[in-house]
Amino acid sequence: MAIKLEDKKAIVAEVNEAAKAALSAVVADARGVTVGAMTGLRKEAREAGVYVRVVRNTLARRAVAGTQFEILNDAFKGPTLIAFSNEHPGAAARIFKEFAKGQDKFEIKAAAFEGQFLAANQIDVLATLPTYNEAVAQLMSVIQGATSKLARTLAAIRDQKEGAAA
């Protein structure tokens, strides 16, 4: 179906704004995925602060031109579903990866993060990035472990000196 020029310009502008504000992007092929499943994916993405859109390849190339996601141009072949993570860099990759487990026909093509192209087999790198809260929790557990170890060491030294003095 033909799209009017004004509509094409609006789509390019909308996707371009999303690309400029995004931390990462993931491109997938959703051919054969049911409407109900896609609706669920879009809902989950919206809740996670991920912008998802099916875009024609030519419009996608124009929309990402001049952004850090221009490196994804080679992935814009066939039906293209593009997702931009706005709040956490791994959000789109994590959502797409989980969705792909239940959908045989859903195929992740590529991703981009900080100007680097990630092939489909490298998506795990992006999907497993901890969120801010997870990273803080990991840091706190490391600090707490070191503090506990120091306290046990000092207590052992104290006990050793008390035993030697008695």
UniProtKB/Swiss-Prot annotation:
Key words, A-Z: Ribonucleoprotein, Ribosomal protein, RNA-binding, rRNA-binding
InterPro entries to which the protein is assigned, alphabetical: Ribosomal_uL10 (IPR001790), Ribosomal_uL10-like_sf (IPR043141), Ribosomal_uL10_bac (IPR022973), Ribosomal_uL10_bac_type (IPR047865), Ribosomal_uL10_CS_bac (IPR002363)
GO molecular function: large ribosomal subunit rRNA binding; structural constituent of ribosome
Alphabetized CDD domains for the sequence: Ribosomal_L10 (cd05797)
Oligomeric and partner information: Part of the ribosomal stalk of the 50S ribosomal subunit. The N-terminus interacts with L11 and the large rRNA to form the base of the stalk. The C-terminus forms an elongated spine to which L12 dimers bind in a sequential fashion forming a multimeric L10(L12)X complex.
NCBIfam families per UniProt: PRK00099.1-1
Family, similarity comment: Belongs to the universal ribosomal protein uL10 family.
Full protein name: Large ribosomal subunit protein uL10
Organism expressing this protein natively: Azotobacter vinelandii (strain DJ / ATCC BAA-1303)
Gene encoding the protein: rplJ
